[in-house]
Amino acid sequence: MKIVTTDSENKAVLYKVASEVEIPLTKTTKEKIEAMRIFYKSFQGKAGFAVPQVGLSERIILVEQHLFDTTMAEETDEPTILVNPSWRPISDKKEWDIEGCLSVPGKVGVVERYVHVELTAWLYHSDTEALSKIKREYHREYSSVLWQHEIDHLEGKIYVDKAKLLLNEKDFYSFRQQLIESGKIQSGMALFDLGPLIYDIVVKGEIPS
């Protein structure tokens, strides 16, 4: 199992609307989920991935637990596994966010996303192989964007198609560090604050004072 990128031979799966997963889960689906859970734990530096990103056109995503349960104090390598997830905006407020993607290595983009969303899904419990229906609201920057990004994958969409601005990852982080060292921005600045700022600097040439 490996991540499918936009340069992979089987990249077509990234642009296909994923199939709804049968509930209750079949034995085959549970075996696939277990294989993906093990794969998820094998690499670092991820917020999560949607199943089409590993070559399967099914509506399942795996994400870091602390992004699903924002009250968690510590991180774990066990993913939260969501089946047939969907989201909807619960306010009209949008902000520019900076995003990257395992399927588009070496790039980051500025994308407009809703700030406040409601997530609905079946939560899979790997220890018991049971499902429970969940509905949660998210108002934090990273989590609210995550659901939009990952569920886009289930709709055959990749963030670069929505990006207002696309940059090389190395150039972005180098530029960000220059801005920090010059005192133009703060190192802990939220992405919803950094996104529009980077856009203004690169596109409009407006350097913050």
Curated annotation (Swiss-Prot):
Cofactor: Fe(2+)
Reaction catalyzed: N-terminal N-formyl-L-methionyl-[peptide] + H2O = N-terminal L-methionyl-[peptide] + formate
First-level EC class: hydrolase
Entry GO MF terms: metal ion binding; peptide deformylase activity
Record keywords, A-Z: Hydrolase, Iron, Metal-binding, Protein biosynthesis
Entry binding sites for Fe cation: 101, 149, 153
Cofactor remark: Binds 1 Fe(2+) ion.
Biological-process GO terms, alphabetical: co-translational protein modification; translation
Domain of life: Bacteria
Family matches, as InterPro entries: Peptide_deformylase, Peptide_deformylase_sf
Gene3D superfamilies attached to this UniProt entry: Peptide deformylase
Keyword ATP-binding tagged: no
Annotated function: Removes the formyl group from the N-terminal Met of newly synthesized proteins. Requires at least a dipeptide for an efficient rate of reaction. N-terminal L-methionine is a prerequisite for activity but the enzyme has broad specificity at other positions.
Family: Belongs to the polypeptide deformylase family.
Designated name of the protein: Peptide deformylase 2
Gene source species: Coxiella burnetii (strain RSA 493 / Nine Mile phase I)
